[in-house]
């Protein structure tokens, strides 16, 4: 694993990077997509909310889990960008725990391995509005991805 963390816009990463962010399980609540970086994901990927809503409902999913969304770059599945939606909490106003974020990160690492994803970008997941300690979350990420052939880029604005 190659790990890099720096100030910058997550969405400036090359499109070869899969992206990850945290969401709540109450995705059908309009407020659940209205704050933080999740709002920016919805703005940049307009169909993400509807896809996640449908996936949660159709599969009767509960948190913690990871929902994969593909964003088509040019109508070719092999060129689709992968977005990992880490469902780390029940309600948009609640907070995740280290247990739920660990389960999601572990699942995402397994998915990256099975999908042969070599590039992953993310914000400081669970640490903005969700208030988890970044040093702890970073250690979870490094532990779960340590044996993978992947480059992880973390971006933050503040």
Can you name each region flagged by the protein language model?
Residues 1-158:
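Macrodomain-like recognition of ADP-ribose-binding/processing modules
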């Amino acid at each position: 694993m190659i790990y890099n963390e720096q100030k910058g816009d997550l969405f400036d990463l090359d499109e070869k990077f899969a992206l990850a962010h945290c969401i709540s399980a109450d995705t059908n609540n309009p407020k659940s997509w209205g704050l933080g970086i999740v709002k920016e994901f919805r703005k940049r990927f307009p169909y993400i909310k509807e896809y996640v809503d449908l996936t949660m409902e159709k599969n009767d999913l509960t948190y913690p889990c990871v929902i994969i969304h593909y964003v088509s770059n040019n109508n070719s599945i092999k060129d689709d960008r992968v977005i990992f939606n880490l469902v780390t909490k029940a309600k948009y106003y609640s907070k995740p725990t280290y247990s739920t974020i660990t389960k999601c990160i572990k699942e995402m690492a397994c998915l990256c391995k099975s999908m042969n994803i070599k590039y992953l970008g993310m914000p400081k997941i669970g640490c903005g509005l969700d208030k988890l300690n970044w040093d702890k979350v970073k250690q979870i990420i490094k532990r779960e991805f340590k044996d993978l052939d992947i480059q992880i880029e973390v971006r933050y604005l503040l």
